[in-house]
């Protein structure tokens, strides 16, 4: 696995603990392999490393050729996310059977079954949250690797601009393993988004 996907960022004991926790039931024959990728942590610079480096260069070239379109998409998505966050924090008013009486509805008493004569102010959800972005890294994406990398980058950049903590992970199946390649983690700085261009699609989709 290390020769194909680089070293795991977990120690051997941590890998055992993670697999014992999550690989149960119908997944008991599955083995999780968590890595930052062969370009980030290679054992040796073998053919798999060179293939991954070549795809990274293709992904970056695609970004360079479509830079303005990608930047525009990032901006549009980021603004949508920011607006959604503002709305999410706003209070809203709903009809209710208790709260502040609305005189204009008093005529309904005895005439209709509608007993919602009041308005009640409710606080919107203000809890914090994080987002996980999963990217299909299986061979089914082999014909559009640069596009997938760009799409992942657009989403990650927009989330970063909106100030939303997020993690981006690629997944595929290889030799009985489910490989989870971490491109960025929740608290990583924005420049870490560039690692999404290390995306390479091969192996299977579990």
Each predicted region: which residue ranges?
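Residue-level preference for alpha-helix termini and adjacent loops
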Residues: 32, 108, 117, 140, ...
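Generic detector of short, locally flexible boundary/turn motifs and exposed helical patches
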Residues: 94-101, 131-136, 196-199
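Von Willebrand factor
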Residues: 107-108, 123-206
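Sequence-level detector for tyrosine residue identity
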Residues: 5, 9, 33, 49, ...
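A broadly structural signal marking compact, well-ordered functional cores
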Residues: 71, 77-88, 137-141, 145-147, ...
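Acidic/polar low-complexity segments with low predicted structural confidence
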Residues: 1-128
